A protein has these predicted regions:
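Structural signal for interior beta-strand "rungs" in well-ordered beta-sheet cores
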Residues: 2-166, 170
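Terminal amphipathic alpha-helical/low-complexity segments used for targeting or macromolecular assembly
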Residues: 1, 6-7, 37, 43, ...
Length: 254
């Protein structure tokens, strides 16, 4: 049985998995679905109407939260603007206090969003990514897998997988510490370093360079190909390295 504080508000149509914990004054709106073991702390609001001026409140949409995710105080997760669809958060995520997820965000498994992170509508975040406190991410941006975003960053471009990013869309190298902790092989790391250099240090249009490198078939690890394939999609453009990093190769050395 899921312990639910008597002051929590859980609307009709909410679905709770086994062993969920709902703390005082949390609000779960109609269409919210929680997996097993989800913890929702005080004053969080899940499934509230999106902050979208043209939204029809009669739209039947929702929010889905994966098993084992922790949602701390005052987190807000808005429901989808589309009928039958949901804003999603994966399993084993940790959303710290005051995080905001706009409508139609898609957050994958094992993501950490630190205090006061703000994701605008339609942002996607890959698995094992960490976003530092106070960072803001523009609508429709894609954030790849295992990205490390520093606190107070302002992100308005797509962030490829496996990188570290700071300040205003500035890539500062590969997230090597995080990748090693995940057990990436030496070969995967070697190819990722080479792919990073090929895309960012060779000059020219990033999408064109990545597409050309992929077509050449020089990279064989799943990780390197995933990095390159990221640049073949998206509409917002891509974050680039700091000049200092580009000049010195910071973040991609052995």
């Amino acid at each position: 049985m899921s312990p639910i504080h008597p002051t929590a508000i859980i609307e009709e149509g909410v679905e709770l998995g086994c062993d969920c914990t709902i703390h005082a004054h949390a609000v779960l709106r109609r269409g919210t679905v929680l997996g097993d073991g989800v913890k929702v702390h005080e004053f969080a609001v899940l499934g509230g109407d999106p902050q979208y001026l043209k939204f029809d409140p009669a739209t039947r949409s929702g929010v889905r939260i994966g098993a084992g995710t922790v949602i701390r105080e005052h987190v807000t997760i808005n429901r989808s603007i589309h009928s039958g669809e949901a804003t999603t958060v994966g399993a084993r995520c940790f959303l710290m206090a005051n995080v905001h997820l706009g409508h139609d965000c898609a957050v994958a498994d094992d993501v950490v969003l630190a205090n006061n992170v703000m994701l605008a509508g339609h942002v996607s975040v890959g698995s094992f990514t960490f976003v530092g406190g106070g960072a803001g991410i523009h609508q429709f941006c894609r954030v790849g897998e295992s990205v490390m975003v520093s606190g107070l960053s302002r992100i308005a471009l797509d962030l490829p997988p496996f990188v570290m990013v700071a300040e205003r869309n500035e890539v500062i190298g590969l997230n090597l510490v995080g990748l090693k902790r995940r057990g990436f092989s030496r070969e995967a790391l070697r190819e990722l370093k080479a792919a990073f250099r090929a895309v960012y240090f060779s000059g020219g249009n990033i999408r064109t360079v990545a597409t050309s490198v992929l077509a050449a078939g020089e990279f064989h690890t799943t990780e390197a190909r995933q990095f390159l394939e990221f640049f073949t999609a998206g509409k917002r453009g891509f974050a680039r390295p700091r000049r200092a990093a580009a000049d010195s190769g910071e973040g991609v050395s052995d």
